[in-house]
């Protein structure tokens, strides 16, 4: 059975893309079939994996979701790129920004990505979705089709207050759209345990995050 994990935090620069690629490659090295989905209009995951001009790609997540919206036939391997580390990639690019705007007028707009996932999930053990640094419609789509959400948090600032909006959104999606949705965990990133500051921040984060829970 395929497990779908969204890697998300509405704050940029916390290590979402690095977490997605490293986790995916690690799973592949353990013999798992892995698909990475770049659901960020910046195309950072696509670029970081060596596909350095994502905006020139003709088949991407945006065009795949467009096919779903328009009820067009599509093969499960549509747009998927192969990587030397043994992972597959559905690339993302700037076209996702336009798609996010157009989703406003689409029926069942929160479930478009779920339809795409249904098409491809039988080919994989894990699907990892690198989300935009926002809580827009593309990110909501990722939450609507995910089994769980992994939240990278940089251990150099106090994010508990900022995380509350993310946790609130996850809870709303769980209640209204995707009752199976859970938080996979909070991943502290960019931690330098050699400094007292980093250790203090990490401990404070753990204390604060223990008070946050997803609403049923």
What are these regions (language model features)?
Residues 1-216:
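P-loop NTP-binding core
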């Amino acid at each position: 059975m395929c497990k779908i994990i969204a890697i998300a935090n509405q704050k940029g620069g916390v290590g979402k893309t690095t977490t997605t690629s490293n986790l995916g490659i690690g799973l592949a090295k353990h013999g798992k079939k892995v698909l990475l989905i770049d659901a960020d209009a910046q195309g950072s995951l696509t670029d970081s994996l060596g596909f350095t001009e994502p905006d020139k790609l003709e088949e991407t997540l945006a065009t795949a979701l467009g096919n779903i919206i328009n009820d067009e036939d599509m093969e499960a391997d549509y747009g998927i790129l192969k990587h030397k580390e043994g992972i597959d990639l559905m690339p993302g690019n700037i076209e996702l920004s336009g798609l996010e705007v157009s989703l406003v007028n689409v029926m069942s707009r929160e479930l478009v990505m779920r339809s795409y996932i249904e098409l491809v999930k039988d080919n994989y053990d894990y699907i990892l979705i690198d989300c935009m640094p926002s809580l827009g419609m593309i990110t909501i789509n990722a939450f609507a089709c995910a089994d769980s959400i992994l939240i990278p948090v940089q251990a150099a600032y106090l994010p508990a207050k900022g995380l509350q909006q993310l946790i609130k959104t996850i809870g709303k999606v769980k209640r209204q759209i995707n009752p199976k949705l859970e938080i996979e965990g909070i991943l502290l990133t960019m931690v330098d345990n050699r400094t007292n500051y980093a250790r203090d921040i990490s401990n404070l984060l753990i204390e604060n995050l223990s008070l946050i829970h997803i609403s049923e």
